[in-house]
């Protein structure tokens, strides 16, 4: 198997392809991409056979911005016989994967492929049994073992491969299944909830998303992102010239500042979270987020960058580079990750966590 498949948002195949080509090249792994517009996936075919496995081991999945999932795969299996679709799939995995911990029969995130979902659910049961009988799959699901993926792109046509459980998306199809809360002011609330799932390990939620923390939401109205913070019993400074949802104001946890989010400065020293979903040029948002982090006005930040029509990967990479440079110049050690989330559209979500500062005495360290 010399190919790597990356699932992505339909319409962002070129960005996903540019990113994997760039980041594979930095590891001296070379190949070519196969891209079909609006297909929801990209194939990176390595020149060296063993490089596909090496790439999915060595390239941290969380460093990929536009990929929802990453797996090694072989050639496309075409025209699987309806009377026996299982044998060719088992044959492709034999000698390649042993004692995998999970099976996922998936489809790309397109309207055409979603019509295959019902078939995938039914097909999973007999395929799982066959893989267990051949010792390709363990008798019980094991979260620390490789995952077998079967990706159907059309009836009777699928890619078969595997991913590593310590370097992939834990979600089926790479998509967290979140339910829209009926009392939330806007659907944008799901962006921040998904960001928490993607960027913050579940066993750290109590520590980093805890009750009683102070947060600032820039460009808050009507309160979709503020809702997530309030739900976690935080005290929130909501900054926006517009009106906040009355249901949030009634909680007593929200202070509404009718001000420009780009000029607002925190009124207190113990702000932990900064969140921002303002419609503005990426460079302007990045610069202001850097101000907050360098000045020690917050510990962690989650913000969205709205993407231009062209050279979207290049634009994101440039802004992340500028942010990294600003933090380094300010003596800040930080973790920076970006991801185009399922609930994002023409945008990506960035998470920054300050680890420590080389310069003592900042506001958040007193």
Curated annotation (Swiss-Prot):
Pfam family, one: RLMM_N
Molecular function per GO: S-adenosylmethionine-dependent methyltransferase activity
GO cellular component, one term: cytoplasm
Keyword annotations of the record: Cytoplasm, Methyltransferase, rRNA processing, S-adenosyl-L-methionine, Transferase
Active site: 306 (proton acceptor)
Coiled-coil regions listed: none
Bilayer-spanning residue ranges: none
Binding site for S-adenosyl-L-methionine: 188, 221-224, 240, 260, 277
Record-level GO BP terms: methylation; rRNA processing
Subcellular location: Cytoplasm
Catalytic activity: cytidine(2498) in 23S rRNA + S-adenosyl-L-methionine = 2'-O-methylcytidine(2498) in 23S rRNA + S-adenosyl-L-homocysteine + H(+)
Catalytic activity, EC: 2.1.1.186
Disulfide bonds: none
Described function: Catalyzes the 2'-O-methylation at nucleotide C2498 in 23S rRNA.
Summary of subunit composition and partner proteins: Monomer.
Similarity-based family: Belongs to the class I-like SAM-binding methyltransferase superfamily. RNA methyltransferase RlmE family. RlmM subfamily.
The name this protein goes by in its record: Ribosomal RNA large subunit methyltransferase M
Organism encoding this protein: Musicola paradisiaca (strain Ech703) (Dickeya paradisiaca)
